[in-house]
């Protein structure tokens, strides 16, 4: 067996085109003959084109000592695309004329264009000694145009290990009834991003009735400081198997810290001319807990009949450690004596969504 180097590349193209023309003749309307909505024609078109390019390189070296195994993988992916749509609505057309371009009253006209791009690089390495001691390390770098300059990149490393205790020589006497015993420690980072584009620039749209004429009005407040929501997770897991895995259990203990949580529609003072931010990084939160999964494989069997059982037990506790005061003002409610409504509060150093009866 020799060293093995493998390359895999693929390109995916997604194309979407939609066209819709509608006509609402005068005969179907119950409005007056001179109403603005009769003899109405609408033309709508929507187009999008997106490319996803992925390149993967995998290297598996050959060791003379078969107790060792190693594999490393690198991957690059680029996603880019554009979309646009246009809608024109014309009313008051002469009988028999169905084209919006024929003229008439124009109660509505809109268009939209969007361009997006994201990419990531990822690297991972896997090492095992006698399949008893296993170590994994990875790193991922993400970039997206959903954030502004200086905030677009996120780095997400992770490390984990596994010790198959049951394979140790000194565990030989337990293998008649203990088929699996392993310990899995791990640490890693992940991130979240908003689902809207162009949040970091000022956007404008046409607005009518500005001193009797059409003008431009701002649509949003640009968000220059918006950044990745980051999650840091520690986990320790245990895998157990009994009697050739007829009974299996996995136990996980974890703690997770979320920094710069993203929240939609954060209310702000109307003196700015707007009522909310589309997105904001509003706070931090801690989660910790445990989870136990218990599975049986043909534990109860008689002839061709058998029964499998699955149980899950879990417990999670969270705590808000930092929160934007504007969010606290928006989410916190007051006691209403008439309907005996309990007081729901988001309060620092307390669980999220705590309910108070006073």
Please annotate each region the language model reported.
Residues 1-24, 35-350, 355:
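Extracellular/periplasmic, surface-exposed regions of secreted and cell-surface proteins
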């Amino acid at each position: 067996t020799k060293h093995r180097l493998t390359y895999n590349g693929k390109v995916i193209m997604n194309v979407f085109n939609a066209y819709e023309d509608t006509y609402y003749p005068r005969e179907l309307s119950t409005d007056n003959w001179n109403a603005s909505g009769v003899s109405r024609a609408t033309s709508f078109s929507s187009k999008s084109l997106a490319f996803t390019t992925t390149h993967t390189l995998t290297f598996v070296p050959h060791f003379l000592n078969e107790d060792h195994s190693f594999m490393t993988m690198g991957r690059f992916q680029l996603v880019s695309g554009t979309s646009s749509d246009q809608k024109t609505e014309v009313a008051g057309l002469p009988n028999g004329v169905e084209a919006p371009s024929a003229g008439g009253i124009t109660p509505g006209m809109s268009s939209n264009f969007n361009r997006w791009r994201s990419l990531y690089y990822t690297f991972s390495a896997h090492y095992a000694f006698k399949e008893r001691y296993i170590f994994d390390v990875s790193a991922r770098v993400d970039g997206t145009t959903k954030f502004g300059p200086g905030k677009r990149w996120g780095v997400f490393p992770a490390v984990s290990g596994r010790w198959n205790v049951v394979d140790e020589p000194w565990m030989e006497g337990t293998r008649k009834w203990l088929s699996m015993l392993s310990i899995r420690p791990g640490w890693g980072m992940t991130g979240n991003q908003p689902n809207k584009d162009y949040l970091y620039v000022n956007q404008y749209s046409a607005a009518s009735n500005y001193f009797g004429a059409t003008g431009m009005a701002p649509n949003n407040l640009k968000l220059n400081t918006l950044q990745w929501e980051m999650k840091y997770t520690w986990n320790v897991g245990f895998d157990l198997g009994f009697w050739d895995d007829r009974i299996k259990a996995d136990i996980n203990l974890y703690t997770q810290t979320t920094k710069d949580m993203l929240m939609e529609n954060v209310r702000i003072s109307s003196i700015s001319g707007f009522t909310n931010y589309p997105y904001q990084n509003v706070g931090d939160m801690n989660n910790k807990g445990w989870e136990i999964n218990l599975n049986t494989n043909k534990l109860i069997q008689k002839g061709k009949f058998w029964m499998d059982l699955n149980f899950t037990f879990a417990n999670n506790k969270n705590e808000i450690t930092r929160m934007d005061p504007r969010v606290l003002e928006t989410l916190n409610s007051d006691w209403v004596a008439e309907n005996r409504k309990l007081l729901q509060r988001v309060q620092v150093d307390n669980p999220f969504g705590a309910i108070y009866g006073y």
